Amino acid sequence: MLHPETSPGRGHLLAVLLALLGTAWAEVWPPQLQEQAPMAGALNRKESFLLLSLHNRLRSWVQPPAADMRRLDWSDSLAQLAQARAALCGIPTPSLASGLWRTLQVGWNMQLLPAGLASFVEVVSLWFAEGQRYSHAAGECARNATCTHYTQLVWATSSQLGCGRHLCSAGQAAIEAFVCAYSPRGNWEVNGKTIVPYKKGAWCSLCTASVSGCFKAWDHAGGLCEVPRNPCRMSCQNHGRLNISTCHCHCPPGYTGRYCQVRCSLQCVHGRFREEECSCVCDIGYGGAQCATKVHFPFHTCDLRIDGDCFMVSSEADTYYRARMKCQRKGGVLAQIKSQKVQDILAFYLGRLETTNEVIDSDFETRNFWIGLTYKTAKDSFRWATGEHQAFTSFAFGQPDNHGFGNCVELQASAAFNWNNQRCKTRNRYICQFAQEHISRWGPGS
């Protein structure tokens, strides 16, 4: 089994050789160095795992401790690049001269050694040993020493790693090329001086929002910043599945709610069941929570008639879902505004209410009015209460602005009754709508 440690004698010999060879292998090995047939394949899975684990372990051992050190993940594409560069055996190529490698924003650690002198694990360990000659406080390497392997290996913002190895020949000698590629690259310079590779501080104390998790294996000295296993900071109940991209629970049949915490056994007598909300959409002429109540159309309570539809404006305030239920009990739905005409007429009418005594509830929240539009995280779009997609829109400037927290839509008085997404628990007045098809099928006195 390979270990990063080497015997004292062999380690000293390797250190001397590395110091002699340096990092710019094209300057050490002559142009007549010839490429040999590739080794039998690239690094195998076990070798890749060993190198990745070693890199992360060494990154957790830096002193002083790193506050922003990222955990490295293996990249097959970087491994292919590293394998291709190892196969060059140190020979300059037009692509290298043109800066192709630099445009890829890839950082490199490279070494040529006599074949069989060292394993890849030992080479990486010796790169890390360069850190003994590096001063983090001064941000520089000791005089006449090389530390660039070390600084790239522990560059905090590098998050992807891939390595390759190739056997070359130089006359009678067999030479082994070791290459590791890192992305994003490190060893950036300012005014000719390489900046420090990481910020010192308590482990994981300066992780960015996208990598706010803290990874620490059993053999790590400190933690490494990583994409959190559960960035949503939530879990789904009753065998629901969490989509960490949308922070939405996909519930099994029979359950609903944000966390699949609500058992839904509702039966719709005269209507269709909406599983995502555990509610019924009633057939024409029926109302109530289960669409079991026969209702009569109350012509005398229409506040507005627009293209045959009846709109009723409530005088009391309630939360969005209670308001929707109250409309349904009457055989209607929360208003669905599907054209500029309806929007303009409702805005004009509600604006007049502001100057009359028709607002009987003094609650400050009742200046706004619920309509039947909500944001559905599962569909990543706003939908009407009947499930239809929202085509027409009249959101106020800067709205909608808080998906996931303000999922219900109101007509906002301060924005000339254009739309605003709001917390569903807010108490607003509301507008019920009875479609023309409802009215024609019920008929007067039915």
UniProtKB/Swiss-Prot annotation:
Gene: CLEC18C
PROSITE patterns per UniProt: C_TYPE_LECTIN_1, C_TYPE_LECTIN_2, EGF_1, EGF_2, EGF_3
Tissue expression profile of the protein: Detected in peripheral blood cells.
Identification of the protein by name: C-type lectin domain family 18 member C
Residue intervals of the EGF-like domain: 228-261
Domain SCP: 52-182
Coiled coil: none
Listed GO CC annotations: endoplasmic reticulum; endosome; extracellular space; Golgi apparatus
Positions annotated with a glycan in the UniProt record: N144
Domain C-type lectin: 306-433
Signal peptide (UniProt feature, chain positions): 1-26
Record's function text: Binds polysaccharidesin a Ca(2+)-independent manner with a preferentially binding to fucoidan, beta-glucans and galactans.
The organism's place on the tree of life at top rank: Eukaryota
Matches recorded under Pfam families: CAP, Lectin_C
Organism: Homo sapiens
One Gene Ontology term of the molecular function aspect: polysaccharide binding
Gene3D superfamilies found in the cross-reference section: CAP, Laminin, Mannose-Binding Protein A, subunit A
